[in-house]
Amino acid sequence: MNIQTIMSSFTAQDKDQEVRPSSSGSWACKEVDEFDALSIEYKPKPTEKYPAKLHARNVRKYLDVGEGLIYLPGLPSFNYEDSDMPPAFRQRRYFYYITGVNLSDCIVTYNIHRDQLWLWIPPPNSGRSVIYNGARPTIKEIMSKYDFDHVETLTHLDSYLTWYAHTEPGKIHVLHDYQAPKNIELQITRKNGCHSIISESPFDSSKLEEAMNTARAIKSPYELRMIRKASAITAQGHLNVLRGLRHLSNEAEIEAIFTATCIAKQAKTQAYGVIAGSGENASTLHYMANNEPLKGRQLLCLDAGCEWDCYASDVTRTVPISGEYTEEAEAIYDIVAKMQDECIELLKPGANYRDIHIHAHKVALKGLMDLGLVEGGTFDELFMAGVSVAFFPHGLGHYVGLEVHDVGPGGSRITNRLYGFDKKPADWTDAYFQILSNTGVTSDGGSILEKDMVVTVEPGIYFSRYALEEVYLKSPNYAKYINKDLLQKYYPVGGVRIEDDLLITEDGYENLTTVLKGKEALKIINEGKEQEEEEEREANRKATESRKQKKTWFW
């Protein structure tokens, strides 16, 4: 069976097989009248628009100012260097959050005091531009489709900003200084009656990013529907890979099946590059070459998720390529599955994600000790020495939303600072502190979970030759605890990672990921295996009989 045959069979199979929930968690929160994850059909209300105004008001709440103007430019159009061809368009996510507009060369302003959201668009195009690229949407079309108080062309924006800076109260809030327009007065003189008082810049870049990060961390009902849609299509892509896996010969075919499934479902953009690492390639966390043969390798680590209307999904599954685990691979998979199951059960509002990450390390260490991969001390000694980080070197998870590694409350998207700590507590060893400082997955604002956040839980155990032999085994602090001889048996495992997207609900969590895993995934991989083996035996029997007949005829 070749890849073309596998792909052609998926359409028929999609109609016959549901994408089933993969682990605990209620479906009760899903608005099934508007979105049915099993059919992967999103059914918007007739008058539904992207909730741009709601999102703008959320930002206003966290900006905590009574007046001012939010100014956000969308992505401008541009071509590759030394080329007349543009890259694939990817809208600036902060702009998209308060607009829902996926068009280039637009700007949005939000008057905080007046509660007015305005979109500024390029003038209508004509001539060759329309012939080649189609007509840009008109003001009337945009007003009917999007949630704005007013839409105006960019030709009037400079005048509007100058008017605002001289007559309206409050600063013009921008994300970054370089995004402030350069063609209006940067220094203005405010007047009090007839007297000039102070000369100052109208722009302020100190508050908006933090406010928008905090707003974006809590998903609106519309955003959750988009993430569900992306998750459902992602599930179908993973399912199709499982169906064909035993008949594939190269990592490239795995990537092709996944992306083709997403595109066929109208999800034409991946939230990140597909990671289809087989064998020892699975030990490279962000392996994306996807070009090596599968033959003779134990596991496939497939980390892949599509976008739907700019909202991401992020799912990882690790499965045996042959449909059967080796003893070593199954042992590692069971540890990682236990890490994930226990950590997911700890999710709820008020839970500290940092503590859940620490729990994952404890489960990993216990499993590695049971296998004899780490030894030479008590559990507490090995834990405080940070030995588990040699095998589990990344954070447990991250926010998911408009970015696959989405922003969180307070600070920037990814930080190297430890959540909730400005410095290492005095009684922590450097190695133990490293376990925690690797949790750079939420923001400086802390790691406390809140209702309507979406986070991943993605524990993993890896046998990276480079990490182990060039880093940890060269450090006496780690090497004395690692069983170097036993490592040789586990290098071919490569790595195991399991990742789901979880919605924090009022009293716990809901697993948004419906991709099969564990024994259910093995059933899909091995579907038809017995029949194929019987057909192969029958073909061999007939070939043997044919050879015998020819031999008899010859004599």
UniProtKB/Swiss-Prot annotation:
SMART domains reported in the protein's UniProt record = AMP_N
Record's keyword annotation contains Manganese: yes
Which reaction is catalysed here? Release of any N-terminal amino acid, including proline, that is linked to proline, even from a dipeptide or tripeptide
Entry's EC annotation: 3.4.11.9
Q: Where is this region: Disordered?
A: 527-555
Named from the GO MF annotations, one term is: metalloaminopeptidase activity
Q: Which UniProt keywords apply?
A: Aminopeptidase, Hydrolase, Manganese, Metal-binding, Metalloprotease, Protease
EC class of this enzyme? hydrolase
Q: Which residues bind Mn(2+) 1?
A: 314, 458, 499
Write down a Pfam family by its short name: AMP_N
What spans are recorded as compositionally biased (Basic and acidic residues)? Answer: 538-547
Q: Which domain of life is it from?
A: Eukaryota
Q: Does the keyword Hydrolase apply?
A: yes
Binding annotation for Mn(2+) 2:
303, 314, 499
InterPro entries recorded? Aminopep_P_N, Creatin/AminoP/Spt16_N, Creatinase/aminopeptidase-like, Pept_M24, Peptidase_M24B_aminopep-P_CS, X-Pro_dipept-like
| GO biological processes | proteolysis
Give the cofactor note.
Binds 2 manganese ions per subunit.
Known cofactor(s): Mn(2+)
Q: What does this protein do?
A: Catalyzes the removal of a penultimate prolyl residue from the N-termini of peptides.
* Family of this protein: Belongs to the peptidase M24B family.
> What protein is this chain from?
Probable Xaa-Pro aminopeptidase BC1G_13431
UniProt organism field: Botryotinia fuckeliana (strain B05.10) (Noble rot fungus)
